[in-house]
Amino acid sequence: MIGIEEKDMIINRIPAKTWNHLHMNQSRVGEVVINRTGELNASVNDVSLIDDGKLNNGELNNIIGGCGQEITEAARKSQTEPVYYITDKKNAGFVRLDFNYGRNNADINVVGIETKENASIDVYMDFNGDKDGEGFAAVQTRLYAAKDSVIRLIQIQRVGSETTFINDIGGYCEDGARIELVPVSYTHLRAHETRSNL
């Protein structure tokens, strides 16, 4: 079993100006033992899976997400297997990623998405877990949008209320490019009536 123990990992180091607005600037996650790569089912359409992760000459790996360097280091030490997708097509369709978390797991996933110049893609990420789960789950998503390209990221969060869930996103846009983020919270869905039919 591969594992990494983190004690008092500090995430989301936000500067003082943000503290003045939100009245929060960081959180501590105490004693996490990450013991596996999270279960991930992928459906792709007209998108390439890159095995070595060397998108854009490695620039994707230099993007820091909102949770800061500590979650990046935890992912590296856990030796989780990243997945990377790339497209050079306009309206390439979608990548759908379904994350399934168990009741007491301690999982982490690393995902990279890159669009080439003038390309566009929709990425659906569905985080689903046991409603009575009390585990830990983290997902680190890195996005690189080349010139005049578009990445649309739609995330649905359906993990249990007692699960510690870290959603770390970082992105970089070249000239004329954009990244659109559409979060959908479990609390905005009537869970007993809602199915994921994206």
Language-model features, listed with the residues they occupy:
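Generic structural signal of hydrophobic/aromatic residues within well-ordered alpha-helices
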Residues: 10, 18, 59-63, 75
